[in-house]
Swiss-Prot record:
Residues at the active site: 22
Binding site for Mg(2+): 22, 24, 221
Protein name: Putative bifunctional phosphatase/peptidyl-prolyl cis-trans isomerase
Organism: Streptococcus pyogenes serotype M6 (strain ATCC BAA-946 / MGAS10394)
Reactions catalysed, as given in the entry: [protein]-peptidylproline (omega=180) = [protein]-peptidylproline (omega=0)
Record family assignment: In the N-terminal section; belongs to the HAD-like hydrolase superfamily. Cof family. In the C-terminal section; belongs to the cyclophilin-type PPIase family. PPIL1 subfamily.
Function: PPIases accelerate the folding of proteins. It catalyzes the cis-trans isomerization of proline imidic peptide bonds in oligopeptides.
Entry-linked PANTHER family: PEPTIDYL-PROLYL CIS-TRANS ISOMERASE-RELATED, PEPTIDYLPROLYL ISOMERASE DOMAIN AND WD REPEAT-CONTAINING PROTEIN 1
């Protein structure tokens, strides 16, 4: 599960000038090839803000899926940092494995009965072909040829093991001086030049551009991202990622299939959220509905469990058990709101289904517009059973003033046209909205009753029951 993002990390994000993405199980799901549609939006949005985008992968260029190539990253760090190009295919850095080291590795592999592969600039090859090798490599590089003497004619930038020895496999001392193993599959490890890593490749881009590590944000999921997570200013692990990588991550986001990259970048403020405002589109909202039946008429509301799940569950739970039956609206202020939900009728009582007060659930997509159903509270995170419905029909602010204050344009327009209580936004949890004209008429009727001390109606306005339509 993804964690919450703290303010300190959001502040660090203000320094980000470039974002690097791993490919497998980061941009796309390796086993299925699925890449979320949101990835295209991510690349376009970052570029539109002047933030550079890069790929940092263990794959070579010829192993990069077409849909990833079509994203046109500004820079590509390939083969775990051994080969770096920009989008114009200018070579920024390259570090082939010395020929004698390749020969020594092949001899050791043959002596150990280990199959291997070699990756050059333009193609990769295998020492042999069997089911174990195919199971490991075909999702990354399909239909590789068998060519064990490839290194005699081409530079080699990376190699692989294919074996069933797992993490216990170790290089002999003479090879470990030059090479290291990075496990990426149950039956395979990358064999890379010692000192070479994605972090090295990214650092070459950073130096080339005159940037600093603090300007770099990286996404990854596997062990070959460890050095990069140490290097970058901000590191984000995918929801499904290696536990050791998660320990180093500044933030663990959602899964690939849950638009984890988009989610993290929106939370960091590097991409503007594409907000939806269900209160302005009730016809297309499918949440549960309730009817508050009172001695002055009925009010029907739709609820928003996706935005305020705990609050909606509390309200529905109390309604279904009859908790609100017979309770009055104990506080009514015309051109403001009507408040109820306290069994003592004093504004001092009430209890949630959780047995204690619970936390606020603020959303960038819900506001205290006229007709909004919100939680009453005694301060932050003190929600119980009390609620109010916003009745105000006019506010002293124009649309442009609200926009300057940070309210989204559609919400600012709704406030200016229909009224509401914008000063309560992010102070009270909005979790529902009146749905029809009849309900608004009843709301206004209740708001117009005569009140006395502490805004309490002189004649009780009673909630007879709340009917729930899940």
């Amino acid at each position: 599960m993804e964690e919450s993002m703290d303010a300190k990390l959001k502040y660090k994000a203000k320094k980000i000038k470039m974002v690097f993405f791993d490919i497998d199980d980061t941009l796309r799901v390796k086993d299925t090839g699925y890449m979320p549609e949101s990835i295209q939006r991510v690349f376009k949005a970052l570029k539109a803000k002047g933030i550079l985008v890069g790929i940092a992968s263990g794959r070579a260029r010829y192993g990069v899926p077409q849909e990833v190539q079509d994203l046109h990253a500004d820079y590509c760090v390939k083969l775990n940092g051994a080969y770096v190009k920009d989008d114009a295919k200018t070579i920024i850095f390259q570090a082939p494995i010395p020929a004698d080291v390749v020969v020594a590795y092949k001899k050791w592999a043959d002596d150990m009965g280990i199959f291997y592969g070699m990756a050059g600039r333009h193609e990769a090859v295998l020492s042999a072909r069997n089911d174990m090798i195919s199971n490991a490599i075909d999702n990354v590089y399909a239909q590789l040829e068998v060519c064990p003497d490839y290194n005699e004619y081409h530079d080699v930038y990376q190699m692989w093991t294919f074996e069933d020895k797992g993490d216990g496999l170790q290089l002999p001392a003479e090879l470990a001086e030059h090479l290291r193993l990075v496990r990426w599959h149950d039956n395979s490890s990358d064999v890379v030049l010692k000192g070479t890593s994605k972090a090295l490749g990214v650092s070459k881009v950073v130096d080339h551009l005159g940037l600093k590590p603090e300007n770099i944000l990286v996404f990854g999921d596997e062990l070959n991202d460890l050095e990069l997570f140490d290097y970058a200013g901000i590191s984000i692990a995918m929801g499904v990622s290696h536990p050791l990588l998660q320990e180093k991550a500044d933030f663990i986001t959602k899964k690939v299939e849950e638009d984890g990259i988009l989610y993290a970048l929106e939370e960091l403020g590097l991409i503007d959220k594409e907000l939806q405002f269900p209160q302005l589109d009730l016809e297309n909202h499918t949440g549960p509905k309730v009817t508050i039946k009172t001695n002055h008429g009925d009010m029907t509301l739709v609820l928003f469990p996706d935005h305020a799940p705990k609050t909606v569950a509390n309200f529905l739970g109390l309604a279904k058990e009859g908790y609100y039956d017979g309770i009055i609206f104990h506080r009514i202020i015309p051109e403001f709101m009507i408040q109820g939900g306290d069994p003592t009728g004093t504004g001092m009582g009430g209890q949630s289904i959780y047995g204690e007060s619970f936390e606020d659930e603020f959303s960038d997509e819900l506001y205290n517009l006229r007709g909004a159903l919100s939680m009453a509270n005694a301060g932050p995170n003190t929600n119980g059973s009390q609620f109010f419905i916003v009745q105000n029909s006019k506010i002293p602010y124009a649309k442009k003033e609200l926009e300057r204050g940070g309210w989204p344009t559609p919400i600012a327009a709704a406030y200016a046209e229909n009224g509401g209580t914008p000063h309560l936004d992010r102070r009270h949890t909005v979790f529902g909205q009146l749905v029809d004209e009849t309900s608004f008429q009843v709301l206004d009727l209740i708001a117009g009753v005569e009140t006395g001390a502490q805004d309490k109606p002189k004649e009780d306005v009673i909630i007879e029951t709340i009917e729930v339509f899940d």
